[in-house]
């Protein structure tokens, strides 16, 4: 089997596996697959989210109420395939960086 056929077969299997995923349990992973985001972009975003979440917790404990700079960093770091609201919602639903993502969702909803 040549390389192209093997790649096509692998893509077919991935599509089938994706259909088996419960999107309610893993909405962020589903979003990554649907949008065909690259591994290195997602790894970079997750590292950034860890840092932003830590910063959010500290700033919130200090009494800060405005987190526009954190949202701006998050939004600018997203690959073009991912929309900020959809991504924050998927991360929160999957239980990742929940306080930070909920804050982002509130901020976006307020406009």
Question: What name fits each language-model region?
Answer:
Residues 23-75:
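Amphipathic alpha-helical interaction modules
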Residues 3-6, 10, 38, 45, ...:
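Intrinsic-disorder-associated interaction segments
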Residues 74-111:
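Amphipathic alpha-helical binding modules
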Residues 17, 24, 56-59, 63, ...:
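Short secondary-structure junctions and interdomain/linker hinges
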Residues 1-31:
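Long, leucine- and charge-enriched amphipathic alpha-helices
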